[in-house]
Amino acid sequence: NVEMLEIDLQITKDGKVIVLHDDSIDRTTNGKGNVIDLSYEEIAEFDAGYNFKDEEGECSFRDQGVIIPLFEEVLKQLPNTYLNIELKGNNPQLVEKVQLLITNYNAEDKILIGSANYFQNKRVHKHLPNCGYYLSRPDLYLFLLVGYFGLLKKYWDKFLTVEAPIEYHG
């Protein structure tokens, strides 16, 4: 059991919302290509367990039918699970599709959502006002500045959390 599951969302060429951190499928599957250039049908042909190594260093998930999931499948399979969602990139269609899915599955009260991209985060705030959200990087810097001057209550009353890695390797 977990209290909250953190996932990243991308949008495919055919407008499907998938659960994937990377912009491409190169690292996580036996395929190649950018998510935005591939349909979900094309992505689902590749083995998402191909490169994953278990604790013994074995590729035990290879050839086991593991595919990159649709966000909708996550909402169906885990209806009572709280989700911390990062929207990747700056595609307005991603926000619109995610809004539709979250609304259709009546999941607003179980979602914490945001994007590191400032413009994408503004779309999130506009389209998903009933979800909790976190700050983009530029908002985080402004948050720190405003906090330094003791003005947080005046300027920030809608976000729920700040996500800032203690360590960053990349």
Regions found by a protein language model. Give the residues of each.
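Catalytic domains of carbohydrate-active enzymes, especially glycoside hydrolases
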Residues: N1-I11, Y155-V162
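Paired acidic/hydrophobic, glycine-rich loop segments that form the ligand-binding mouth/hinge
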Residues: L5, G132-Y134
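Conserved metal-phosphate-binding beta-hairpin within the catalytic cores
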Residues: L5-I11, V17, I85, N91
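Short catalytic/ligand-binding loop motif for oxyanion handling, primarily in non-cytosolic enzymes
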Residues: D14, L94, N121-K122, L142-L144
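Metal-dependent phosphodiesterase/phospholipase catalytic core, i.e.
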Residues: H21-G132, L151-G170
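Short, charged, surface-exposed secondary-structure boundary motifs
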Residues: T29-N30, Y141-F149
